[in-house]
């Protein structure tokens, strides 16, 4: 799965926000600028199973690990 990150990909940026999640909320979750509001809206709209306490669609984009 490491090869997925090799080469110029736009995955470091925000690709397409998951359906049902507004763009501003998605940006807030990804950048972590306003986690309280963004995560609340995201959790209210996404019903997918969570991985490590994060919504599955967030895990797909592999955000920076926050369990240091």
Curated annotation (Swiss-Prot):
Residue numbers spanned by region Disordered: 28-68
Gene (name only): KCNQ1DN
Protein name, entry field: KCNQ1 downstream neighbor protein
Annotated tissue distribution: Shows reduced expression in Wilms' tumor samples.
Organism: Homo sapiens (Human)
């Amino acid at each position: 799965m490491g090869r997925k990150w090799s080469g110029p990909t736009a995955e470091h940026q925000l690709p397409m926000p998951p359906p049902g999640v507004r763009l501003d909320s998605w940006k807030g979750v990804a950048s972590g600028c306003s986690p309280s509001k963004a995560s609340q809206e995201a959790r209210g709209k996404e019903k997918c199973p969570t991985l490590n306490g994060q919504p599955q669609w967030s895990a797909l984009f592999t955000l920076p690990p926050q369990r240091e």
